[in-house]
Amino acid sequence: MKHTIYALTMFALAACTSPQEEAIDRHALVTRNNPEVTAMDSLSSLSVGNGEFAYTVDATGLQTFPEVYKNGVPLGTQSQWGWHSFGNPENYKPEEALVEYDFGHGHKELYATQPKEPDRAKEASDWYRVNPHRLHLGIIGLELENEVRPSDVQNIQQSLDMWNGIINSRFTLKETPYHIQTVCHPERDMIAARLSAQQPAGIKFHFPYPTGGHCDDACNWEAND
């Protein structure tokens, strides 16, 4: 009987003892989820950044065809410090966009509203809902011949190495293979790209005026300023 009780006790202790947990292979966990892109897809843009600054690219590894991604996931270059406000010629005050409400705390509190009636309060609310807005710092892409179209970019093989923060973009353009590596500085608002190709390619810089929109590419190319 004693032997039986002893055996049952040891069995119970063994059942309650959890096996030693294995360490997580973080590198394998991250790298097996690296996103891959094989087409010029407006919903498949990739980004590199450092938490304070980010740069989003198309399938070329730069921002060569921003118009293709305009209505998808736009190609942005934005930072935590890059903000802009439109002029305030009517001199709207913040308090003009606030209304007192009783939330049951024993006193009235100011709350930002969006009036529907067309009066000064609505205009003030509309202005403060738009301003300030994040600024697109500029488009940086390949300078290609005018007749080159997005469909001319073939054999796309692009991946984001999330462990090292590198976007590798391989493609052919007019039978010329290209390889572009895109990175962001881990602490500064800087990006770098390495281009390998048999044919020389230039780099273009375009600086848009902001739109103040909520769901657009933040690029106004019609403004004179």
List the model feature ranges, each with a label.
Residues 1-8:
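Sec-dependent signal peptide recognition
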Residues 14-15:
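C-terminal motif of bacterial Sec signal peptides marking the signal peptidase cleavage site
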Residues 21-225:
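Beta-sandwich/jelly-roll carbohydrate-recognition scaffolds of carbohydrate-active enzymes
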